[in-house]
């Protein structure tokens, strides 16, 4: 099932979670940070295709619509391994001693997994000069913090989406202007929130604007004091929430049935609900928003790097980006995808914010894995292990 419809935003099994986080924590020290940013023997050209490409993907990220033409053109036969969560992707990449174990060549990782893979030495740097479409990406996704460390690229961005505030227009005659509607008692029992530890960043972003004295400048880099304040807010929110949704379809059903009136979601849910004549709209409040972005990353032990580079080159082209965007309710990274999108579905470029102004993109704080290193030479930030534990306490 496709990513936007059925992608799980919550938890993998405890075994997968433990395996993923243990190595991630080990890779977040100074030596890991240094080596992650160290350039190493990047290829200057794409060699002869090896004939095979093994991908870990969000289900449907290599649909026949664009996979079959790639196979015919390159001779690279694509083999797929679907993953249902970021934790599962990390765990799969760490089979066989890590780095894909020689079994997997690439992974379509989201921002809450990419730094775990980089600092865990599971992926290798890539030469974006070999990916012509990269130069046409929106600036925010050319060298984002979630896949580029100290100027070294560990993959190429693919699709992205903002986390928007969705609301019932009959209950809200005008658009809410603040995320505060999700934290106030007025809509108790009518609120829906994603069931994902990275949701902590949304609360931190809200506090960065409403409680500036906390000094939050990056919602993914929180000191203990900032983190505790954020968790306290989420615990106060808990009694107000009708449902923590695991799948986009769960939130769609809740809005369609009238069970909820307002919540955090993606443009996919909004457009799907509108197609069903449900009175909803979406907005990005004054505090800004978080957002997810996926990256095709090259496994450190990839046996078919040439086919991998050809795949990155292929999926970065405007037409393929447009095909995937419309297939999943996502927004392409390539700015030249819009004409292809509109040709396929009139007005879709605007519907998915692909033609949004720079200010819109700048208002989005894209997911990245929380690590102990705050980037200031100190290791006083709360890492992802603690985020996961705290989220269990909030929602359990």
Regions found by a protein language model. Name each.
Residues 1-52:
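Short, low-complexity disordered leader/linker segments with a strong preference
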Residues 102-108, 244, 261-266, 281-282:
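Paired acidic/hydrophobic, glycine-rich loop segments that form the ligand-binding mouth/hinge
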Residues 244-275:
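Oxyanion-binding "anion nests"
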Residues 299-365:
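Mature extracytoplasmic/periplasmic domains
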Residues 28, 37-116:
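Early extracytoplasmic/lumenal segment of secretory-pathway proteins
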Residues 361-396:
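Conserved C-terminal helix/tail region of periplasmic/extracytoplasmic solute-binding proteins
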Residues 265, 274-327, 396:
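Extracytoplasmic/periplasmic substrate-recognition and gating elements
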Residues 56-64, 86-88, 103-104, 108-256:
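Extracytoplasmic ligand-binding site segments that recognize negatively charged/polar headgroups
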């Amino acid at each position: 099932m496709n990513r936007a419809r059925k992608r799980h935003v919550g938890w993998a099994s405890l075994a997968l979670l433990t395996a993923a986080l243990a190595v991630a924590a080990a890779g977040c020290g100074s030596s890991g940070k240094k080596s992650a940013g160290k350039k190493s023997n990047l290829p200057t050209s794409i060699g002869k295709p090896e004939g095979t490409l093994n991908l870990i993907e969000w289900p449907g990220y290599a649909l026949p619509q664009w996979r079959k033409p790639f196979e015919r053109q390159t001779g690279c036969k694509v083999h797929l391994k679907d993953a249902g969560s970021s934790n599962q992707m990390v765990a799969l990449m760490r089979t066989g001693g890590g780095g894909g174990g020689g079994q997997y060549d690439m992974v379509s990782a989201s921002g809450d997994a990419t730094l775990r893979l980089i600092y865990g030495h599971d992926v290798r740097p890539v030469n974006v000069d070999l990916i012509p479409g990269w130069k046409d990406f929106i600036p925010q996704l050319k060298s984002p913090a979630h896949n580029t460390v100290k100027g070294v690229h560990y993959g190429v961005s693919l699709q992205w989406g903002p986390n928007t505030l969705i609301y019932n227009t009959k209950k809200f005659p005008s658009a809410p202007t603040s995320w505060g509607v999700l934290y106030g008692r007025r809509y108790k029992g009518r609120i829906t929130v994603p069931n994902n530890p990275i949701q902590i960043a949304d609360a931190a972003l809200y506090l960065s604007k409403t409680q500036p004295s906390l000094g939050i400048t990056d919602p993914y880099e929180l000191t203990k004091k900032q983190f505790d304040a954020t968790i306290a807010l989420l615990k106060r929110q808990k009694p107000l929430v009708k449902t923590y949704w695991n799948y986009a379809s769960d939130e769609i059903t809740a809005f369609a049935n009238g069970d909820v009136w307002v919540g955090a979601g993606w443009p996919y849910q909004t457009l799907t609900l509108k197609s069903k004549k449900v009175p909803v709209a979406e907005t990005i409040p004054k505090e800004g928003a978080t957002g997810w972005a996926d990256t095709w990353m090259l496994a450190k032990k990839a046996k078919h790097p040439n086919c991998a580079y050809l795949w990155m080159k292929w999926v970065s082209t405007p037409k393929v980006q447009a095909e995937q965007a419309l297939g999943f309710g996502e927004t392409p990274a390539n700015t030249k995808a819009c004409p292809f999108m509109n040709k396929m579905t009139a007005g879709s470029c605007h519907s998915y914010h692909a033609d949004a102004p720079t200010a819109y993109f700048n208002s989005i704080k894209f997911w990245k894995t929380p690590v102990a290193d705050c980037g200031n030479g100190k290791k006083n930030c709360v890492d992802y292990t603690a985020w996961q534990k705290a989220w269990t306490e909030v929602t359990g």
